[in-house]
């Protein structure tokens, strides 16, 4: 699967999509393929604040539990509750159905510090 060019990426394998004044966050195809079949997703609540490089939730697969790391600072304005009943969306549709949270960024310039698709692909080749 190709890496969508219109997103930014963190070293912890989260993606960020700018949508006006907000950003949508999820995990990458590479991350879900490394984790295997996702069976549970734990996400924070609307109104919670996230801090860049700090955990904001977790995904549990048949292999392991992995923390989700915030790529930017901000306040959560929306959570994808569909993942409660359908965690398999993370495997099936990591960039569409399986977004995790929507955030109002504290500072939109932080997004520029994240990797482009090309940089992310280069990093994951080395893993």
UniProtKB/Swiss-Prot annotation:
Binding note for cofactor: Binds 1 lipoyl cofactor covalently.
Designated gene of the protein: gcvH
Assigned GO CC terms: cytosol; glycine cleavage complex
Function: The glycine cleavage system catalyzes the degradation of glycine. The H protein shuttles the methylamine group of glycine from the P protein to the T protein.
CDD domains linked: GCS_H (cd06848)
SUPFAM superfamilies: Single hybrid motif
Protein name: Glycine cleavage system H protein
Domain of life: Bacteria
